[in-house]
């Protein structure tokens, strides 16, 4: 089922085009890395569409808005967790100027270590969100396990797998890495195929 999508030349070209955009982000300036970080904070426990809409409500004034003003903007955008995410974003602003210089050298050496560094140092990002951020700035060795990917794993018979802790995430990631190797694609891009399979679109 997924193999047919991977073999689809038109879809594969779209995924590879998206991958090139992520690689460009890797070479981009701090503002691009920061924007991707904020998007991933907003995507946590929310849909990409909702997160992207919320991002556009705050990004132009993200450094001038108070936490309370940011919360109100997010609420106006129809975003659910406006108070909590405003707090996370306000804290993330303190990283601006050092985000890329801190994370890139670690990720260039070990993407797993970079993911753990992000989890330890940036509020609001867990395994999924940290993997998502790293993928969006050009690192493709980590799995992004959202509800679409979980649904896919359960579809192919992985015993109703649920992500309740790190152990569950790492187990699911190991399964996805095996699938990716078998399909000849990088695991950080696998979710794009799965997302397309379930929604008929590529965003993220």
UniProtKB/Swiss-Prot annotation:
It catalyses: 2'-deoxyribonucleotide-(2'-deoxyribose 5'-phosphate)-2'-deoxyribonucleotide-DNA = a 3'-end 2'-deoxyribonucleotide-(2,3-dehydro-2,3-deoxyribose 5'-phosphate)-DNA + a 5'-end 5'-phospho-2'-deoxyribonucleoside-DNA + H(+). CDD domains: ENDO3c (cd00056). Keywords: DNA damage, DNA repair, Glycosidase, Hydrolase, Lyase, Multifunctional enzyme. The active site is at 128, 146. Pfam families: Ogg-HhH. One of its GO terms (molecular function) is class I DNA-(apurinic or apyrimidinic site) endonuclease activity. The keyword Cell inner membrane does not apply. GO terms for biological process: base-excision repair. The record marks 204 as: Important for guanine/8-oxoguanine distinction. InterPro entries: DNA_glyclase/AP_lyase_Ogg, DNA_glycosylase, HhH-GPD_domain, HhH_base_excis_C. Its EC number is 3.2.2.-, 4.2.99.18. Signal peptide: none annotated. Catalyzes the excision of an oxidatively damaged form of guanine (7,8-dihydro-8-oxoguanine = 8-oxoG) from DNA. Also cleaves the DNA backbone at apurinic/apyrimidinic sites (AP sites). Belongs to the type-2 OGG1 family. NCBIfam families: PRK01229.1. This is 8-oxoguanine DNA glycosylase/AP lyase.
């Amino acid at each position: 089922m997924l193999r047919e999508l991977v073999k689809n030349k038109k879809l594969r070209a779209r995924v590879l085009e998206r991958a090139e955009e992520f690689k460009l982000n890797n070479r981009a300036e701090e503002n691009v890395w920061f924007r991707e970080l904020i998007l991933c904070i907003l995507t946590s426990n929310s849909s990409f569409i909702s997160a992207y809409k919320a991002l556009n409500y705050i990004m132009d004034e993200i450094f001038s808005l108070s936490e309370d003003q940011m919360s109100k903007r997010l609420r106006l955008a129809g975003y659910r967790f406006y108070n909590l995410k405003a707090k996370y974003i306000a804290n993330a602003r303190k990283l601006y100027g050092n985000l890329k210089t801190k994370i890139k050298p670690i990720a260039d050496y070990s993407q797993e270590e970079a993911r753990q560094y992000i989890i330890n140092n940036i509020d609001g990002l867990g395994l999924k969100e940290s993997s998502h951020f790293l993928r969006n700035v050009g690192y493709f060795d980590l799995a992004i396990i959202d509800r679409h990917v979980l649904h896919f794993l359960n579809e192919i018979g992985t015993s109703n797998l649920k992500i309740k802790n790190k152990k569950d995430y790492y187990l699911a990631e190991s399964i996805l890495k095996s699938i990716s190797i078998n399909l000849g694609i990088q695991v950080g891009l696998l979710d794009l195929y799965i997302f397309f399979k379930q929604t008929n679109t590529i965003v993220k």
